[in-house]
Amino acid sequence: MAEATYTPRLRTHYDSVVRPKLIEEFGYKNPMQVPVIEKIVINMGVGEATADTKKVTTAAADLARIAGQKPVLTRARKAISNFKLRENQPVGAKVTLRQARMYEFMDRLITVALPRVRDFRGLNPKSFDGRGNYAMGMKEHIVFPEINYDQVEQIWGMDIIVCTTAKTDDEARALLRAFNFPFRQ
């Protein structure tokens, strides 16, 4: 039985444009040395979950719509009485995207979601961690086209972490620039 092979647009772009560009720029001898995006982790912390646990499930449903994959509920590791937080209480949701879903999400993030962010001046070029990973935060999850603005009960923020195999921040920055990430000048 022959399976239909589907390759995301950005994966094809990586193979045809990004990889040769990075080999030329950094002078890699082996094509396996070229950095690649390993995974994208989306984390949504719901602070109001201490009062109402239903909000976590609503946030998780929105995150599932955005990512196209069921999220894992994150739970409190220890109890903190000042925050009215008990151990093992759900406090958020997270999703790890790899392969095709990762490229599809990245495509929607770059082409649709980031241009819809209010007062967007570009991504912070200093948000690299020193090991080739990039982290960014979004204040509103309603910028994604999968979320219907009229049916949203509450607006939540999210953290998006792009993990790469790059050894340095410069390599990771060149990789993400080649994918047209809109960095601030």
From Swiss-Prot:
GO terms for molecular function: rRNA binding; structural constituent of ribosome; tRNA binding. Pfam families: Ribosomal_L5 (PF00281), Ribosomal_L5_C (PF00673). InterPro entries: Ribosomal_uL5, Ribosomal_uL5_bac-type, Ribosomal_uL5_C, Ribosomal_uL5_CS, Ribosomal_uL5_dom_sf, Ribosomal_uL5_N. It comes from the Bacteria. Keywords: Ribonucleoprotein, Ribosomal protein, RNA-binding, rRNA-binding, tRNA-binding. GO terms for cellular component: ribonucleoprotein complex; ribosome. The keyword RNA-binding applies. GO terms for biological process: translation. This is one of the proteins that bind and probably mediate the attachment of the 5S RNA into the large ribosomal subunit, where it forms part of the central protuberance. In the 70S ribosome it contacts protein S13 of the 30S subunit (bridge B1b), connecting the 2 subunits; this bridge is implicated in subunit movement. Contacts the P site tRNA; the 5S rRNA and some of its associated proteins might help stabilize positioning of ribosome-bound tRNAs. Belongs to the universal ribosomal protein uL5 family. Part of the 50S ribosomal subunit; part of the 5S rRNA/L5/L18/L25 subcomplex. Contacts the 5S rRNA and the P site tRNA. Forms a bridge to the 30S subunit in the 70S ribosome. This is Large ribosomal subunit protein uL5. It comes from Azorhizobium caulinodans (strain ATCC 43989 / DSM 5975 / JCM 20966 / LMG 6465 / NBRC 14845 / NCIMB 13405 / ORS 571).
